[in-house]
Amino acid sequence: MKRTYQPSKLVRKRRHGFRSRMETVGGRKVLASRRAKGRKRLSA
């Protein structure tokens, strides 16, 4: 059986990176809530 997590830096950046978050309204909300919470890292 193949494991579900197959790490890839490129895919990680494209799916969960800052720029991809900024592209959508939902992503912006994610960043806003993480800023409000005071997260050191906002995105991957």
UniProtKB/Swiss-Prot annotation:
Ribonucleoprotein listed as a keyword: yes
Top-level lineage group: Bacteria
Basic residues bias: start-end ranges: 10-19, 31-44
Residues covered by region (Disordered): 1-44
InterPro entries associated with the record: Ribosomal_bL34 (IPR000271), Ribosomal_bL34_CS (IPR020939)
GO molecular function: structural constituent of ribosome
Pfam families on file: Ribosomal_L34 (PF00468)
Keywords: Ribonucleoprotein, Ribosomal protein
Listed GO CC annotations: ribonucleoprotein complex; ribosome
Annotated GO biological process: translation
Extent of the signal sequence: none
Family: Belongs to the bacterial ribosomal protein bL34 family.
NCBIfam families assigned to the protein according to its UniProt record, in alphabetical order: rpmH_bact
Full protein name: Large ribosomal subunit protein bL34
